[in-house]
């Protein structure tokens, strides 16, 4: 009976412990996102920061790249002006797709306004090491920073609810 009681409490506490692993990350002064677990962080000499998380069951990856465009000599005004041109968004899309390789197919794309920011939303299919992957990405600019938020579905068992929760956790403070 006592063992049964202990096992019962473990089943009650386990979901609570799992929920508490969520980690809110400040990407810029005005942009936050919550990862399902604590991500690995790499800062590359103030040029870029990379946040990455691979789920323990390897069904999905969650990644965010924050690139400081000011380090490329661009000003905030130049970036704001460039965003007004469709060619700017086309270049963001094509450069991201080029990084993924020739096997990449665009499943859907849309430009959406989230908290006053134009966000390019891409859903892609690609192949890596003979395995098919599906990706969803939000690409946008905040001040001098290019932000690319990516979820990679690596296996059929990947939770779409977890993916949607990740993207829905994006907070942009105006």
Name every feature range the model reports, one short phrase each.
Residues 21, 27, 37-39, 143-174:
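Surface-exposed amphipathic alpha-helical segments
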Residues 18-32, 75-80, 173:
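Sec-dependent signal peptide cleavage junction
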